[in-house]
Amino acid sequence: ESGMGKTHLLKAAKNYIESNFFDLKVSYMSGDEFARKAVDILQKTHKEIEQFKNEVCQNDVLIIDDVQFLSYKEKTNEIFFTIFNNFIENDKQLFFSSDKSPELLNGFDNRLITRFNMGLSIAIQKLDNKTATAIIKKEIKNQNIKSEVTSEAINFISNYYSDDVRKIKGSVSRLNFWSQQNPEEKIITIEIISDLFRDIPTSKLGILNVKKIKEVVSEKYGISVNAIDGKARSKSIVTARHIAMFLTKEILNHTLAQIGEEF
């Protein structure tokens, strides 16, 4: 799936190899970039095609992101297959990412699928709330946001964007822009965040009611709806309960009296 962090992971692998193995030559490109280069070189002479293959094979590590973009391109696949074999025969490293597992990839020669399956395949799971929160905090630091962002505000962002790394980074960029425009605000609260992202909740949650809000919040925090409705005072449950109550007020415009009855 898009936004799961595949590109980030491959770039991290590239940076790690280059930082720790100085003698290794690494080539990183997207599947689309490789396909465009192959299509261009196929218009040229046989000698130039072989030269292109040799140039790629001079690398010790080849990393291709979104390899599915090479599907249904017969001539491009032939070039790719030759390069793939060369790396295997010379005991070199190959890293690929795709939007599905090898056996589900269509538009590739069976020989390539077999070779894909020879390697180690790892499915990247959707982010959990803890990981999403860690990414948000790191991105806030990377973007050098001066204002303090409260934990409730961070949880609010995590609740809506924990399924997409790109959206997480985009949301922090939006927050950064707002912070630069409002330097007098030293603390960014959940109230500020909810106003800043007021265009999100309806499309994200669909038909809204208190039950739906409780279900979404409880799922994100890994607790039951009964826990939100109960009297337990553990930190995670209290935070989830407060988030659900706040969303009920902000999204459904319920009064405090109504919220008291519903929680």
From Swiss-Prot:
<feature type="region of interest" description="Domain III, AAA+ region">
    <location>
        <begin position="1"/>
        <end position="179"/>
    </location>
</feature>
<comment type="function">
    <text>Plays an essential role in the initiation and regulation of chromosomal replication. ATP-DnaA binds to the origin of replication (oriC) to initiate formation of the DNA replication initiation complex once per cell cycle. Binds the DnaA box (a 9 base pair repeat at the origin) and separates the double-stranded (ds)DNA. Forms a right-handed helical filament on oriC DNA; dsDNA binds to the exterior of the filament while single-stranded (ss)DNA is stabiized in the filament's interior.</text>
</comment>
<dbReference type="GO" id="GO:0006270">
    <property type="term" value="P:DNA replication initiation"/>
</dbReference>
<dbReference type="InterPro" id="IPR010921">
    <property type="entry name" value="Trp_repressor/repl_initiator"/>
</dbReference>
<dbReference type="InterPro" id="IPR020591">
    <property type="entry name" value="Chromosome_initiator_DnaA-like"/>
</dbReference>
<dbReference type="GO" id="GO:0006275">
    <property type="term" value="P:regulation of DNA replication"/>
</dbReference>
<dbReference type="InterPro" id="IPR027417">
    <property type="entry name" value="P-loop_NTPase"/>
</dbReference>
<feature type="binding site">
    <location>
        <position position="3"/>
    </location>
    <ligand>
        <name>ATP</name>
    </ligand>
</feature>
<dbReference type="Pfam" id="PF08299">
    <property type="entry name" value="Bac_DnaA_C"/>
</dbReference>
<dbReference type="GO" id="GO:0005737">
    <property type="term" value="C:cytoplasm"/>
</dbReference>
<dbReference type="GO" id="GO:0003688">
    <property type="term" value="F:DNA replication origin binding"/>
</dbReference>
<dbReference type="GO" id="GO:0005524">
    <property type="term" value="F:ATP binding"/>
</dbReference>
<keyword id="KW-0235">DNA replication</keyword>
<feature type="region of interest" description="Domain I, interacts with DnaA modulators">
    <location>
        <position position="1"/>
    </location>
</feature>
<feature type="region of interest" description="Domain IV, binds dsDNA">
    <location>
        <begin position="180"/>
        <end position="263"/>
    </location>
</feature>
<keyword id="KW-0067">ATP-binding</keyword>
<dbReference type="InterPro" id="IPR013317">
    <property type="entry name" value="DnaA_dom"/>
</dbReference>
<feature type="binding site">
    <location>
        <position position="7"/>
    </location>
    <ligand>
        <name>ATP</name>
    </ligand>
</feature>
<feature type="region of interest" description="Domain II">
    <location>
        <position position="1"/>
    </location>
</feature>
<feature type="binding site">
    <location>
        <position position="6"/>
    </location>
    <ligand>
        <name>ATP</name>
    </ligand>
</feature>
<keyword id="KW-0238">DNA-binding</keyword>
<feature type="binding site">
    <location>
        <position position="5"/>
    </location>
    <ligand>
        <name>ATP</name>
    </ligand>
</feature>
<dbReference type="Pfam" id="PF00308">
    <property type="entry name" value="Bac_DnaA"/>
</dbReference>
<dbReference type="InterPro" id="IPR013159">
    <property type="entry name" value="DnaA_C"/>
</dbReference>
<dbReference type="GO" id="GO:0008289">
    <property type="term" value="F:lipid binding"/>
</dbReference>
<dbReference type="GO" id="GO:0005886">
    <property type="term" value="C:plasma membrane"/>
</dbReference>
<protein>
    <recommendedName>
        <fullName>Chromosomal replication initiator protein DnaA</fullName>
    </recommendedName>
</protein>
<keyword id="KW-0446">Lipid-binding</keyword>
<keyword id="KW-0963">Cytoplasm</keyword>
<comment type="subunit">
    <text>Oligomerizes as a right-handed, spiral filament on DNA at oriC.</text>
</comment>
<keyword id="KW-0547">Nucleotide-binding</keyword>
<comment type="similarity">
    <text>Belongs to the DnaA family.</text>
</comment>
